[in-house]
């Protein structure tokens, strides 16, 4: 079995299930830490800051620091800064994306911004959509942190960022650049942070459509763990198979 020098790890469904602890995840990450294998938690959640994400992981007894968290907000801000280092950005979104924009030396703009970024915004208003549409029509480049149409909550499935993004797409006729999983952009950014090559990095996740496809799109090896969204019975012959598939992260510990 191939030994990997770095791990990119999904959160919900892989490290925990909502508010429920996954015991095997704790042992898995502790083993990575004890053996000195670098790892980075990669999430499509654009609303939380790295510290907030790390604090939640620690509450589940999973070893994590904010430096070991890579959010779609961070990937989005870095992507924009690479395009134009002093760009102005009109942001629809919450604390996570706004903090990432500031930390990358970008400024906030309005109808004449260089970029429009859409992240999940649970206080969305018509005016926010209106300014975003006007900026795009004025030539702003259109970026979306991720295309998740719905997000699971205790109440059930609620509108995700892809749903918000679609309002601007339909109104302007402009398709955004998506950053988060299953796109390769967030994976490439994360590997730069981790400092490992694509051939020696493993993507670990529970959701075939986002986590595993992100790894496949980035040319990475993938490990599908059936503790969340995608069960064994969901896999069909016409789907590109993950490199590895397991029922519990405990099964992978001997290969770390």
Swiss-Prot record:
Reactions catalysed: a ribonucleoside 5'-phosphate + H2O = a ribonucleoside + phosphate; XMP + H2O = xanthosine + phosphate
Disruption of the gene: reported phenotype: Inactivation of the gene has essentially no effect on cell growth in rich or minimal medium but results in a drop in pNPP hydrolysis in the crude extracts of B.subtilis cells to undetectable levels.
Keyword flag Hydrolase: yes
GO molecular function: metal ion binding; phosphatase activity; XMP 5'-nucleosidase activity
Major subcellular location class: cytoplasm
Family annotation (InterPro entries): HAD-like_sf, HAD-SF_hydro_IIA, HAD-SF_hydro_IIA_hyp1, HAD_sf
Top-level taxon of origin: Bacteria
Main enzyme class: hydrolase
Keyword list, A-Z: Cytoplasm, Hydrolase, Magnesium, Metal-binding
Induction notes from the record: Cotranscribed with the two upstream genes, yutD and yutE. YutF overproduction increases the level of yutDEF operon expression, and this up-regulation is enhanced in the presence of inorganic phosphate.
Subcellular location: Cytoplasm
GO cellular component, as recorded: cytoplasm
One Pfam entry name: Hydrolase_6
Cofactor(s) named in the record: Mg(2+)
Family matches, as CDD domains: HAD_Pase_UmpH-like
EC number per UniProt: 3.1.3.5
Function according to Swiss-Prot or TrEMBL: Catalyzes the hydrolysis of various purine and pyrimidine 5'-nucleotides, showing preference for 5'-nucleoside monophosphates and exhibiting the highest catalytic activity toward 5'-XMP. Also shows a relatively high phosphohydrolase activity toward the nucleotide precursors ribose-5-phosphate (R5P) and 5-phosphoribosyl-1-pyrophosphate (PRPP), and toward the non-natural substrate p-nitrophenyl phosphate (pNPP).
Family statement: Belongs to the HAD-like hydrolase superfamily. NagD family.
Family matches, as NCBIfam families: HAD-SF-IIA (TIGR01460), HAD-SF-IIA-hyp2 (TIGR01457)
Subunit architecture: Homodimer.
Record PANTHER family: 4-NITROPHENYLPHOSPHATASE-RELATED, HALOACID DEHALOGENASE-LIKE HYDROLASE DOMAIN-CONTAINING PROTEIN 2
Protein name, UniProt field: 5'-nucleotidase YutF
Gene: yutF
């Amino acid at each position: 079995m191939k030994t990997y020098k770095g791990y990119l790890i999904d959160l919900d469904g892989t490290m925990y299930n909502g508010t429920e602890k996954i015991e095997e995840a704790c042992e898995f990450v502790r083993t990575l830490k004890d053996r000195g294998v670098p790892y980075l938690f990669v999430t499509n959640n654009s609303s939380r800051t790295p510290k907030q994400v790390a604090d939640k992981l620690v509450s589940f007894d999973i070893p994590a620091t904010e430096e070991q968290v890579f959010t779609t907000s961070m990937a989005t801000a870095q992507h924009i800064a690479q395009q134009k280092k002093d760009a102005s950005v009109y942001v629809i979104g919450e604390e996570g994306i706004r903090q990432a924009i500031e930390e990358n030396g970008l400024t906030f703009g309005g109808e004449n911004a260089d970029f429009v970024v859409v992240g999940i915004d649970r206080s969305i208003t018509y005016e926010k959509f209106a300014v975003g549409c006007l900026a795009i029509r004025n030539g702003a480049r259109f970026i979306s942190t991720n295309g998740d149409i719905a997000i699971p909550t205790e109440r059930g499935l609620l509108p995700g960022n892809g749903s918000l993004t679609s309002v601007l797409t339909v109104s302007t006729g402009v398709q955004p650049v998506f950053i988060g999983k299953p796109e390769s952009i967030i994976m490439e950014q994360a590997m730069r942070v981790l400092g490992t090559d694509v051939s020696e990095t493993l993507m670990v996740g529970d959701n075939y459509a986002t986590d595993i496809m992100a790894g496949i799109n980035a040319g990475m090896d993938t490990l599908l763990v059936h503790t969340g969204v995608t069960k064994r019975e969901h896999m069909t012959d016409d789907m590109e198979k993950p490199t590895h598939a397991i029922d519990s992260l405990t099964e992978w510990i001997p290969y770390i």
